[in-house]
Structure formats: structure tokens, C-alpha cells
Amino acid sequence: MNMARDIWFETVAIAQQRARKRLPKSVYSSLISASEKGVTVTDNVESFAELGFAPHVVGAPEKRDMATTVMGQQISLPVIISPTGVQAVHPDGEVAVARAAAARGTAMGLSSFASKPIEEVVAVNDKIFFQIYWLGDRDAILARAERAKAAGAVGLIVTTDWSFSHGRDWGSPKIPEKMDLKTMVTMMPEALTKPRWLWQWGKTMRPPNLRVPNQGARGEDGPPFFQAYGEWMGTPPPTWEDIAWLREQWDGPFMLKGVIRVDDAKRAVDAGVSAISVSNHGGNNLDGTPAAIRALPVIAEAVGDQVEVLLDGGIRRGSDVVKAVALGARAVMIGRAYLWGLAAEGQVGVENVLDILRGGIDSALMGLGRSSIHDLVPEDILVPEGFTRALGVPPASGS
């Protein structure tokens, strides 16, 4: 009798269930956290269910092509890894995610708050976009960008939509400032209830890394997470002139992440960006912001012929990806979905999540009678009246 554990899971929802089962409560809560009441994070997911398909009954293509490019990188499906901070839910963290993305032929955004240095991540995946928050002065920001370029990053993602919202109805995740002996003793009762997670970390002979090595110079441990976070809170928010300045400094593809308004999308184009991501920071930003998919169609129509438009927020199925692409996205970025896979099964779990999305994309293309994601059009999607949100659009003359 084969007693080997079946590690494969069928849906992203099952990956989430496994992550909840295997992680200490405080660690798992950091993966589901959202700002305030959680209106936006809920809308991100549930809004996709409001969209329908217009399938064909005969003439489905024998083969379906999902390949595309994002910021100059050829990828095998229109899904890339979104940058998320401190992936210490698994000892291999961002390195495991990068390996999984490479194995499935796609690119990865690496957070400047990552738990692994960029040099280690680029070593296993040469399609890395480095993400930067506006933290510190221009010299410090430029130094991080130059380190990323030297390491081999092929693009820059700038995230500026964070508003430091306070208060979560279900409580904020309890992340210690440092993993010293006192902290480990305090957390031990909780960790003992999750022996598999404890065993994974025990094998490494080191506690979870709560430092952010990409905020310092190469070879340094970097500051503790909360020290860097505090500096970020104390840094004046960037202006459009700052974005244009950084764009001039970076010789390569450049994405502005967090765009939800048409007027901001147009300003981003004027600043010279290569791509934008229609996003509300996964519901971790200003609660009450519309779901990204609601804002996508109007933004894509306004600037989609000038820059690459991506979407992130709420992707749980391949059919969600197809809906986003049909409504104007070049590709989507995923966050919580792959973190749950990482927590559940490490690199294999992330690969599993990408395989789930690939299968769902293929099935939806077949049903719609489309041989390629590039053949998708808005008419393939049933969009109910009142679904879209046109933010930052001047009122019509005479209205």
C-alpha cells in the first residue's frame, strides 16, 4: 500500500485550506489580512462571479495558445508573480517561488521587503522585476534600483498606493520585531500546534528571517522589517515629478503598480512608464476602493494602446484570468494564491497553483472558441449593467 502523502490540490481554495491548517495562526493571518472592514478585498474576489461568458457550442479549437510577453519578457501564460513582502511562511521563501515561476515559464516580481536577497532570487529565475516602495531619499531609492540592475533584474515595479490604513476588524497580524530567544519562547505554544511548519524551520537551524535584505547593500542582512516599515511611513509620498525622475534613472521596463483611476493612468503614461497594474494592493490599501476588475475596462480603453495594462487583485481561477484579459489586461499578477501554495507545499505548491490557473485558462478558451488569449475580446464576457467603475474620468460636456 502506498502511504505517500498526496500533495496535489485541485483548487486555490484547497491551497488556502492547507495553508490555514499548516501555519501558526499569527502567520496565516498575515496572508489574509486586509484593511479595515475588508470591503475591497471581498469585492476583488466576488466581482469576478458577476461576470459571465458567451461560449460557442461548435468549433472549439484543437489547441489553445496562452503565451504572451510582459515588459519584454516572454511568458508561457498571462500570469506573473506579484511582489509580496517577507515570504517567511516557508524556509525557502522567494527562492522557492522564483524556481516555481521559472519551472512554469513565467516572471516574478520581487518585493523590496522580501526575506531573500535579490541576488539569490535572480540566480534561479532570470525574469525578475524588482519592486520598490518610496522609502528614503532619492539616493537611497536609486541605490536599491542600481543594486537590482546589477543583480540582473529585467524590470522595475514602483508601488505608491499604500495609505497606511489603521485598524482591521479581525485584528492585525502579530508579527514580532525580531525572532530572538524571548520571542521564540513566547510563540512556542502556538508553533507546537503546527509540527510540520516547526519541523521545516527546525531543519534549517535558523528562525524565520524578519529582516529585509534588499533594503541594504549587497551582502548585508538589511534592517528589521519594522524599522524599514517605520522609515517608509516617515518618507514623504512621491510626486509625479519623482516618478518621472526614477523612470529616467532606470534603463529598462518600468511599471507603476496601484493605478485605479483613468486620470492617474494618463499621468503615468506622461511620466514614461512601460506598464501599469490596475490594483488596490489586494485590499490592503484604502478600504472601499472598487475591485480592480471593475476599474480595468475603462483604464484599458483609455491607455491600453500606449502602455501594457495588467491587473492584480482577486484572481483565484483561470477563468478569472480570461475575464481580465478579455476586458483589456495583457496579463494578471497573483499574490495570496501563490502564497497559500507556498505555505501548503513549498515550491511544488506554487507550481500547483500556476498549473490550476493554466488549466482554467485553457478550459475557458476552449469554451469561448478562442485559439489564443490574444483573440479574446470584450464581447466574450457578459458584463452586467453598472459593473464597471470609471474613476478619474471628467464628466461629459453638458452633464
UniProtKB/Swiss-Prot annotation:
Protein's job:
Involved in the biosynthesis of the enzyme cofactor mycofactocin (MFT). Catalyzes the oxidative deamination of AHDP (3-amino-5-[(4-hydroxyphenyl)methyl]-4,4-dimethyl-2-pyrrolidin-2-one), forming an alpha-keto amide moiety on the resulting molecule, which is called pre-mycofactocin (PMFT). This reaction occurs via a 5-[(4-hydroxyphenyl)methyl]-3-imino-4,4-dimethylpyrrolidin-2-one intermediate, which converts to PMFT. The alpha-keto amide moiety is the redox-active center for the redox activity of mycofactocin. Is required for the in vivo ethanol assimilation in M.smegmatis.
Where is FMN annotated to bind?
111, 131, 159, 257, 312-316, 335-336
One matching Pfam family, short form? Answer: FMN_dh
Tell me the GO BP annotations in alphabetical order.
Answer: mycofactocin biosynthetic process
Q: Tell me the null mutant phenotype.
A: Cells lacking this gene lose the ability to utilize ethanol as the sole growth substrate. They are unable to produce PMFT(H2) and glycosylated (methyl)MFT(H2), and accumulate AHDP and glycosylated AHDP.
Give its E.C. classification number.
1.4.3.26
The record's section on Gene3D superfamilies has: Aldolase class I
Which GO terms label this protein's molecular function in UniProt?
Answer: FMN binding; oxidoreductase activity
Residues annotated for a 2-oxocarboxylate binding in this entry: 133, 168
Q: What is the lineage of its organism?
A: Bacteria, Bacillati, Actinomycetota, Actinomycetes, Mycobacteriales
Q: What is this protein called?
A: Pre-mycofactocin synthase
Catalytic residue list = 281
Tell me which NCBIfam families the record gives.
actino_HemFlav (TIGR03966)
Q: Which residues form the FMN hydroxy acid dehydrogenase domain?
A: 4-386
The cofactors it requires, by name, are:
FMN
Enumerate the UniProt keywords alphabetically. Answer: Flavoprotein, FMN, Oxidoreductase
The Swiss-Prot or TrEMBL record describes its family as follows:
Belongs to the FMN-dependent alpha-hydroxy acid dehydrogenase family.
The reactions it catalyses are: 3-amino-5-[(4-hydroxyphenyl)methyl]-4,4-dimethyl-2-pyrrolidin-2-one + O2 + H2O = pre-mycofactocin + H2O2 + NH4(+)
